A protein has these predicted regions:
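Mid-domain Rossmann-like dinucleotide-binding core that forms the NAD(H)/NADP(H) cofactor-binding site
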Residues: 133, 145-231
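C-terminal substrate-binding/catalytic core of Rossmann-like NAD(P)-dependent dehydrogenases/reductases
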Residues: 236-241, 245, 282-332, 343, ...
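Glycine-rich beta-strand-centered segment in the early N-terminal region that forms part
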Residues: 22-36, 49-100, 147-148
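Glycine-rich cofactor phosphate-binding loops and adjacent beta1-alpha1 units
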Residues: 171-176, 188, 198-199, 211, ...
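Short acidic-hydrophobic, aromatic-tinged amphipathic segments that line or gate anion-handling sites
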Residues: 224-230, 333-340
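Cysteine-cluster motifs in flexible loop/terminal segments that predominantly coordinate metals
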Residues: 39, 90-144
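Short Gly/Pro-enriched turn/cap motifs at secondary-structure boundaries
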Residues: 20-21, 53-59, 122-127, 134, ...
Length: 370
C-alpha cells in the first residue's frame, strides 16, 4: 500500500500511514507523486483554523506522473492522458454545476458542494491529498499536462501561490504601464510580482520582509522594494514619491496580515483598485476609516478567493514560457520526505523556507529529472 503523511488533528504530529490503493473507476487515474507543496494553508490546517474532516492527507497542489488510468481519461483539449504523462490538477473537485454560484454568478470557487484535495477529503476516503506516494484522480478531476519543456519543479515552485496570484493580477485589470504595489513577499506575493511584471506594470513595488525575500522579489520583476522595518508612514511617503504623489494604481494584498489591508487602502491612489487575496483564514479585524479610505477616495476593493481551472491551465503555459526569466524553480528552498513532513510544516510556519515541498518518491524525482 502507498504511504502517506496523515494529519490526525490540530497541533498533533503527522503520522506516516499505509493507505489502500483505490480500485479505479472508469475515468479515474492514479498518479505517482513527484512534488506536493507545503502551503501556508497547511499550517492553518495544522492549527485547526479551518473546518476539515480529520484525519486528512494534506497537499492540495501537486505534480505527479500518471501510473495508471481506467478507460479513456482526457484533458480539456480532448488529448488522452496516458501512463507516463506529467500532470498537475485542479484541487477543487465536485463543484455541482447546478447551483446559484456555479450557474448564475459563474463563481465556482464559491460552490457550497465543492470538495478540495488535501483539505476537505478525509484520509479515510483514500489517497486524496498530495503528501502521499500516490494520488487518486477521481473521475472528473481536471488534469493539466505539463509541457515537456517545463521542469515540474518550476511549476511547483509557484504552487498554490502561482494560481492564486494569477487570479489576483487578473482582477486588477492592469493596464500597460500602471503602477502596482504587492504587499507580502511570500509565495503568493512573489508570483503576484512576477505576473504583474509580465502584464506590463510600470512601477512595481514589493513590500515585505525579510530582506532576502525582497531581493528575490526584484528578481521576479519588482522595480522597488520597501521593508516592513520601515514605519508605515514612511512606506506611504516612499510610495507617493515613486508615483508622482498620487499612490499606486493598484494594490494586491498577499500577506495574510490584517494591517496590510489597512495599508493597501492608504497606498492606492484616488480611483484605484485594491485586491485582497491574502486573508484566507481569520487573522482578526482591522480598523479602517470608511469616509477617508473608501468613499472619498472612490476606490474599488475586491476579495480574491482561490483559483479556477483556467488559472491552472494558463499557469502551466506561462511557467513553461517564462520559467527561465522568472525564478520560480529557485523558490523551492527545501524538499522533505514523508518522514520529515512535520519539519516541513515548521519550516513554512517559521518562514525559514520561501517554498517547501514534499517529495514522497525521491528516487522517482531523481530518475525523472536527472
Amino acid at each position: 500500500m502507498p504511504l502517506a503523511a496523515v494529519m490526525t488533528g490540530p497541533r498533533r504530529p503527522l503520522e506516516v500511514r499505509d493507505i489502500p490503493s483505490p480500485n479505479l473507476e472508469p475515468g479515474a487515474a492514479l498518479l505517482r507523486t513527484l512534488y506536493s507543496e507545503v502551503c501556508g494553508t497547511d499550517v492553518h490546517l495544522h492549527h485547526g483554523r479551518l473546518d476539515v474532516p480529520f484525519p486528512i492527507i494534506p497537499g492540495h497542489v501537486s505534480v505527479g506522473i500518471v501510473e495508471a488510468a481506467r478507460g479513456r481519461v482526457a484533458d480539456i483539449e480532448g488529448d488522452a492522458i496516458k501512463e507516463g504523462d506529467v500532470v498537475t490538477f485542479l484541487d477543487v473537485h465536485e463543484t455541482c454545476n447546478n447551483c446559484y454560484y456555479c450557474l448564475v454568478a459563474r463563481q465556482p470557487t464559491r460552490c457550497l458542494k465543492r470538495r478540495v484535495y488535501g483539505i476537505s477529503y478525509s484520509a479515510n476516503d483514500g489517497l486524496l491529498g498530495g503528501w502521499a506516494e500516490a494520488i487518486w484522480m477521481k473521475p472528473g478531476v481536471k488534469m493539466v499536462k505539463l509541457p515537456p519543456e517545463l521542469n515540474p519543479k518550476t511549476f511547483i515552485g509557484g504552487g498554490c501561490g502561482l494560481v492564486t496570484a494569477l487570479h489576483a493580477v487578473d482582477m486588477t485589470e492592469l493596464k500597460l504601464g500602471e503602477s502596482v504595489a504587492v504587499l507580502g513577499a511570500g509565495p503568493v506575493g512573489q508570483s503576484c510580482v512576477a505576473f504583474a511584471s509580465l502584464s506590463g506594470a510600470g512601477e512595481l513595488i514589493a513590500v515585505g520582509a525579510p530582506n532576502d525575500r525582497l531581493e528575490f522579489a526584484r528578481r521576479m520583476g519588482a522595480t522597488a522594494t520597501l521593508s516592513l522595518e520601515i514605519p508605515p508612514q514612511e512606506r506611504l511617503e516612499a510610495v507617493r514619491r515613486l508615483t508622482g504623489g498620487r499612490g499606486v494604481d493598484a494594490v494586491i494584498e498577499a500577506s495574510g496580515a490584517p494591517e496590510a489591508v489597512k495599508q493597501a487602502l492608504d497606498l492606492v491612489r484616488d480611483g484605484g483598485r485594491v485586491i485582497v487575496c491574502g486573508q484566507y483564514t481569520d487573522n482578526g479585524p482591522v480598523e479602517i476609516h470608511p469616509h477617508w479610505q473608501l468613499n472619498r477616495k472612490h476606490i474599488e476593493i475586491k476579495g480574491c478567493w482561490g483559483a479556477r481551472y483556467d488559472h491552472f491551465h494558463r499557469a502551466a503555459a506561462l511557467t513553461a514560457r517564462y520559467g527561465e526569466r522568472k525564478p520560480w524553480r529557485e523558490m523551492v528552498s527545501d524538499a522533505f520526505t514523508l518522514d520529515s513532513a512535520n519539519a516541513a510544516l515548521r519550516a513554512v510556519e517559521d518562514r525559514t523556507a520561501i517554498k517547501a515541498v514534499i517529495t514522497p518518491n525521491p528516487e522517482l524525482v531523481r530518475s525523472k529529472l536527472s
